[in-house]
Structures are given as C-alpha cells and as structure tokens.
C-alpha cells in the first residue's frame, strides 16, 4: 500500500503558508524526492537554514503527517555589510556595500533581497560608481519564479588630449529588468537537473559632458535559456551547464551598434557552457579541497560589446588588477584553486587561472599584442564571529605586452553580518 501525505503543519515559528514549498499536498503520494525538494526550498532562506521535517503517523492507515520544525531563533531580516577593493581606478577602487535579505515578506516562503554598493571616495566628484538592485523570488514545488531590477552608474574624467582639448566627464548608466522561471524536472538522492528561462530588458546610456553618446545607446529585450545538472559524489560534486542567450529585435527599442556591421539588424545569439568540479582529499593527516571551473562562450554571429567575454581580474583570471582587460565575443576561462585549513576555521589557498578571447573585439586595445592571460594568486580567508575576510596577493604569469597591470595585485574583501 503506497504511503500518502496526511497533513502538513508547522511546529511553531511559522513564517508563512507552507503549501508553495511542497510539490505534493495532503492526500498526495509520499515521495522522498518531494521531501528533499521541499526542504531545499525552505532552507534557501538564511533564517531557515536549520529547518527540519518530522514525519509522524497520520490519522488514516498509510498516512504520514509532515511537521515543519523551524529553528528556535529564526530572524527574518539579515544584513550583510561589505567592503572591498574590487572597483577600478577610473571609477573608484575601494567599494562599500550592504545587502538586506528578508525571509517570507509575503508569508509565502518567498524572499526579498535589496543591495546597494558605492565607491568609498564619496567626496571625489570626478570618479565614482554606484550599483543597486532589488530581487524577489518564490518557490512553487519543483519550480521557482523571480523578478528583479538593477541599476549601475559610473562617472570618470577623460584626460585632456595633446591638442589642448579640456578633460571631459564621462557618465554611464545601465538598467536591467528581469523575470525568470526555474524548473527541476529530474531529481535523485545525489543529483538534480534544473532548467531556467529568463526574459530581460537592458537599457544603456552614456554622456560625455552634456552630449549623449548615441553610439553607446542600447535598449535591448533578450532571453536566456539553459540547463544545469549537479551530481554529488562521496568526496565532492560535479556541476555542468549549457545555455543560450540572445536578443529579441521585435521587442527591442534600440538594439545598438556593432563595429563594422552598419546593416546589423539587432539580432544576436551566444552559447555558453560551464563545467565545475569540487573534490576533497587527504595527504597524510591534512585535508585539502580543490575546485576547478571551466567556462566557454561562443557567438556564431555578430554581438554587441556588452555581451563580450572579459578576462583579467579577481572574478575571471586572478593575478590582474582589472584596470585593463581582454575582451572578445568568443573565449574561455579556466580557474583552479587548492585550499587547506589553517588556524581554526580559516583556510589558505593557491590559485592558477588562465583565459583566452577570440572573435570580434579580441584584437582591439591590449588584445593587439595577444589574447591569452595566465595568472596566479595566494590568499587566506575565514572569519571570526560575525566578521569574514578574504585577502590575496596575485601576479600575472603571461599577458600581452600592451596590457598594463600591477606587478602584484592585492585583493581584499571584508564582510560583517548583522
């Protein structure tokens, strides 16, 4: 006789209506994979990471009641303050930020995340950057929906030319609106496949002095579809993904321009693939962790520069300060990191990364002298109580002669939780 769900109820500390968490409801078949999905849905909320399910005999023969047991201290609002030097010299190297996450604001086990980031040189009117965003998501069994809006602005001053022209301020602004659906069509005790469907709008504007630069004007509606699979192993995990994104010219008010393509119709398409591996192992009594990630991008036709793959910096090829990068419509990034524990909950790590760009845009700027970067980095990260840190020193190992970067790149990131 198949088991069925009796009732679903909370054991105190309820933060919302639990129905959206569960793929099946009262009187539906009891399935372990459904319970795994529901538990993942609730634990994605920061304040519910310790939530557990109790399974109790139901009132009818074959029924099982599900009791949602929440943490004793489940704060619904979390704040994370950040400070780092991940910016650019041209728009503000040092950055300050805050992230506010609200659990179940609509009592649907949904989540609202609001972020704000700014350069630390608030009194400097010649350079600066700000970023802000708001995103909301909600689970619906094996699916989830999300919407978001973000804005990024920057200002810098272009140097005066040799002919005597005055320095001019350059201001840029990007806004993005997004709606997404994610579905889990396949799940086992050790693996999960996720499909994603995203519709977005991107609006770019820039001004040089008081003049709007029409060459940089874009208002593009686009799509992004993809599939990702995660497989848990005894001592690690494997992740693989494939995606396609592109534009919808019929809905785009201003598709922008592509160099050397005066008759471009605004349609572009890109393919991406990602493969990542996490592995834990021992050498004698010491534990190590390895993480490797390979990301590939290919554009079969013309694409705007906003879609180019950029390499050279802490989030792509480490060892470079990020002030100058290589960019191209096609390319790949391979990141490798080996870490081991040190003094308590902290760890030290070493990284070796490489990347290459090709296709449109790759031979412009520093790319005229080469299209490949190789860099390395060593660092330490960890935390104490509510404070976290990540400090690393990196250096370029191989680069084009025309790409200017510091001989040693210092990457610092600090966080504080409230």
Task: State each model region's role.
Residues 55, 81-85, 112-118, 147-153, ...:
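Transmembrane beta-barrel strands of outer-membrane/channel proteins
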Residues 111-113, 124-219, 223-227:
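Transmembrane beta-barrel wall of Gram-negative outer-membrane proteins
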Residues 94-98, 130-134, 175-179, 221-225, ...:
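Hydrophobic, lipid-facing positions within transmembrane beta-strands of outer-membrane proteins
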Residues 100, 380-388, 405-418:
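Outer-membrane beta-barrel "beta-signal"
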Residues 1-87, 117-130, 292-295:
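Periplasmic polypeptide-binding modules associated with outer-membrane biogenesis and secretion
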Residues 76-78, 106-112, 141-147, 188-193, ...:
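Repeated loop/turn-to-beta-strand initiation elements of outer-membrane beta-barrel proteins
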């Amino acid at each position: 006789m198949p088991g069925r769900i009796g009732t679903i109820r909370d054991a105190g500390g309820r933060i919302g209506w639990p129905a959206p968490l569960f793929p099946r409801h009262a009187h539906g078949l009891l399935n372990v994979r459904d319970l795994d999905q529901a538990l993942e849905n609730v634990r994605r909320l920061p304040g519910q990471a310790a939530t557990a399910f109790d399974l109790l005999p139901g009132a009818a023969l074959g029924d099982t009641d599900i009791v949602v047991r929440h943490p004793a201290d489940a704060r619904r609002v979390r704040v994370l303050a950040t400070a780092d030097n991940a910016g650019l010299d041209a728009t503000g190297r040092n950055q300050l930020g805050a992230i506010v996450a609200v659990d179940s604001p609509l009592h649907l086990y949904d989540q609202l995340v609001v972020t704000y980031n700014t350069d630390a040189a608030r009194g400097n009117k010649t350079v600066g950057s700000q970023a802000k965003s708001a995103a909301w998501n909600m689970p619906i069994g094996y699916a989830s929906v999300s919407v978001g809006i973000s804005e990024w602005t920057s200002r810098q001053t272009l140097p005066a030319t040799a002919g005597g022209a005055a320095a001019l301020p350059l201001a840029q602004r990007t806004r993005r609106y997004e709606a997404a659906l994610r579905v889990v069509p396949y799940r086992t005790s050790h693996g999960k496949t996720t499909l994603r469907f995203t519709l977005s709008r991107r609006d770019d504007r820039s001004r040089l002095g008081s003049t709007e630069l029409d060459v940089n004007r874009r208002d593009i509606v686009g799509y992004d579809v993809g599939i990702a699979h995660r497989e848990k192993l005894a001592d690690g995990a494997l992740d693989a993904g494939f995606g396609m994104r592109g534009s919808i010219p019929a809905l785009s008010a201003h598709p922008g321009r592509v160099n050397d393509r005066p008759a471009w119709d605004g349609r572009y398409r890109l393919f991406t693939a990602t493969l990542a591996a996490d592995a834990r192992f021992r050498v004698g009594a010491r534990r190590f962790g390895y993480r490797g990630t390979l990301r590939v991008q290919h554009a079969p036709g013309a694409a705007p520069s906003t879609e180019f793959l950029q390499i050279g910096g802490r989030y792509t090829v480490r060892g470079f300060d990020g002030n100058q990068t290589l960019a191209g419509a096609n390319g790949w990034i391979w990141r490798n990191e080996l870490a081991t524990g040190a003094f308590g909950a902290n760890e030290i790590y070493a990284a070796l990364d490489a990347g290459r760009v090709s296709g449109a845009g790759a031979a412009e700027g520093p790319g005229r002298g080469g299209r490949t970067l190789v860099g390395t980095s060593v660092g330490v990260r960890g935390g104490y109580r509510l404070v976290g840190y990540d400090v690393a020193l990196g250096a370029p190992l191989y680069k084009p002669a025309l790409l200017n970067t510091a001989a040693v790149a210092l990457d610092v990131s600090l966080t504080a939780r409230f």
